[in-house]
Structures are given as structure tokens and as C-alpha cells.
């Protein structure tokens, strides 16, 4: 896994789990998920899928390479920008039937499950906010999210869902994701001795012994490293 992450987690995270990776813009949420999936799969006979709703797969691959994270045959980046474009075209020509993205993600999981079987173990969804923006606002949304999280667990996956959080720490979304999720990993910035330091903090992780302290992280061309607990001032 990511060097130094054993300072935060005392034991392995067993699947199935749905883990929210939250933080303000620019807090390296995408990089963290990339690094974690890539380093985890390196020594495993397993498969991972990175599903992006916001950027193209090509853009993500370029970002990974610039971070020093190599895309392996055990990992695929899938984008849904084509489907979004189809939706917009339908809107212009007057077809009101919109793609059900929750159902689309479920079908995508089933397709990779057929190909890889139980070796398909890790999924990243980038991001929950983008998923909401693609769904029509309705009173059914909370129920749909409950079903969505359950479906991810039923597929025996460790799923990391990226979720934007404002600088004040408040989630800008529906508010029940934290309750539904098995884990919450917060990425942020803290001022230490006049310098801004990136940190990682596990706010919650069911069935896993972990530190709740903020841990400094460093991102270089060779990847991400967890340095150790932040000094409290």
C-alpha cells in the first residue's frame, strides 16, 4: 500500500467496504485513490476499476503518469463522458429519458465481474457530487443512495467514493452519506510553523483498528507517502 499508511491503519481493511474520501478542492483526493489502488494491486492477483464521471480516461492517465503512478494491466480507468454527451444530445432533440447512472454503474460492475470474477476487488468512483449532478433531484434520491451503497457491498468490493467537502468541513451534499458509509477518510491542509501541510485523517472505519490523528502526507513525482502524526500547536 502507500508507504507509511501502516502508521494509520493497524490492520487490513477487509472487503466489502464503502469508503468516502473527502476534502476541499485541491486536497489530492484523486491522487490518494490512484496511489492506493495502484500500490495495493501491485502485489495482488486482483483487478481494480477507476470510474470517472468528470474527466476523460485519457486525462486521468496523464495525471497518474505525472504523479509517477503507472497504470497496470490490473487496473482500468473508465469514463462516462460519452454517456453524458448522449444525454445532452437527447435533451436538445427533446428526448426526456435520461440515463440512470446508478443503474449504469451497477451494469458496469456486473460486466467487470463477469470478466474478472471475484478478483475484481477495488472500485473508485470520482465523484459522488458528479453522480448527483447527473441525477434528477427527487425525494427518492436518499433511497437510491441507500440501494447504491448496498449494491456495492453486495458485489464484495472495497469502494472508494470521492466526495468534495468545503473548507469549513461541511459536506455540500445530502448529508446521509457519512451515515451510510463504512469509512470516511478526510484529506486536508493544515498550517504548521507557518507552512501549509497536507494531511490525512481517518474519521471513521468500521471493523478496522486505526488512528484518528491527522497524519502529514507528502506527494512527490514518485507518489504519495504518509509521514506521521501532525504536531499539535
Where on the chain are the PLM-derived regions?
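Conserved P-loop
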Residues: 24-93
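NTP-binding/hydrolysis catalytic cores, primarily Walker-type P-loop NTPases
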Residues: 2, 15, 97-101, 107-121, ...
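Phosphate-binding/switch region of NTP-binding enzymes
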Residues: 158-222
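Pre-Walker A adenine-sensing motif
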Residues: 1-12
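Phosphate-binding/switch loop-helix module in NTP-utilizing enzymes
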Residues: 86-154
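Conserved nucleotide-binding/hydrolysis micro-motifs of P-loop NTPases
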Residues: 54-58, 81-85, 128-131, 165-169, ...
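Short hydrophobic/aromatic beta-strand immediately N-terminal to the Walker A/P-loop
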Residues: 18-22
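Structural recognition of the conserved hydrophobic beta-strand(s) that form the central parallel beta-sheet
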Residues: 50, 122-126, 154-165
Amino acid at each position: 500500500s502507500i508507504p507509511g499508511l501502516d502508521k494509520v491503519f493497524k490492520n487490513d481493511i477487509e472487503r466489502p467496504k464503502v469508503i468516502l474520501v473527502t476534502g476541499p478542492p485541491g486536497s489530492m483526493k484523486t491522487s490518494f485513490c490512484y496511489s492506493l489502488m495502484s500500490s495495493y494491486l501491485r502485489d495482488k492477483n486482483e483487478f481494480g476499476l477507476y470510474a470517472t464521471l468528470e474527466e476523460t480516461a485519457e486525462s486521468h492517465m496523464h495525471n497518474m503518469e505525472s504523479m509517477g503512478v503507472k497504470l497496470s494491466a490490473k487496473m482500468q480507468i473508465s469514463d462516462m463522458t460519452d454517456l453524458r454527451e448522449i444525454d445532452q444530445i437527447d435533451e436538445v432533440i427533446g428526448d426526456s429519458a435520461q440515463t440512470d447512472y446508478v443503474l449504469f454503474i451497477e451494469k458496469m460492475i456486473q460486466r467487470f465481474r463477469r470478466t474478472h470474477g471475484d478478483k475484481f476487488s477495488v472500485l473508485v468512483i470520482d465523484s459522488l457530487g458528479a453522480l448527483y449532478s447527473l441525477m434528477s433531484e427527487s425525494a427518492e434520491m436518499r433511497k437510491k443512495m441507500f440501494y447504491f451503497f448496498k449494491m456495492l457491498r453486495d458485489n464484495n468490493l472495497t469502494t472508494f467514493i470521492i466526495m468534495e467537502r468545503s473548507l469549513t468541513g461541511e459536506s455540500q451534499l445530502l448529508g446521509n452519506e457519512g451515515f451510510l458509509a463504512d469509512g470516511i477518510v478526510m484529506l486536508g491542509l493544515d498550517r504548521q510553523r507557518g507552512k501549509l501541510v497536507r494531511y490525512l485523517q481517518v474519521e471513521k472505519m468500521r471493523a478496522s483498528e486505526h488512528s484518528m490523528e491527522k497524519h502529514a502526507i507528502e506527494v512527490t513525482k514518485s507518489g504519495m507517502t504518509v509521514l506521521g502524526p501532525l504536531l499539535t500547536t
